[in-house]
Amino acid sequence: MTYGKLIFFIIVLVGFALFMSFNVEHRCDVSLVFYTFQAVPITLSLLFAFACGALTALLFLIDPDAKTRKQKREDSPTSAPTGGVSSPEHVDVP
């Protein structure tokens, strides 16, 4: 359930940043290679950078081998091999 809390926290931060961006009048121009966005709120550009970082972090948190590890655990025997003996009571000692 930790991923749910993390995603909820990110959504709350995004909502707070959007609220700030519409109420603060600090603006800048954001220049990309082929196009320039004019009068972009600074908080909106920071929010975009934060969202890119959060997405990158979430991608690194996803474990691609989780299914294979779980399947290997289910396929492996639950106890160590005993050589066909189920318990020490049935062992014939010469």
UniProtKB/Swiss-Prot annotation:
It is a multi-pass membrane protein. Keywords: Cell membrane, Membrane, Transmembrane, Transmembrane helix. Residues 68-94 are annotated as: Disordered. It is found in: Cell membrane. It comes from the Bacteria. GO terms for cellular component: plasma membrane. The chain crosses the membrane at residues 7-24, 39-61. Its main location: membrane. This is Uncharacterized protein TP_0753. It comes from Treponema pallidum (strain Nichols).
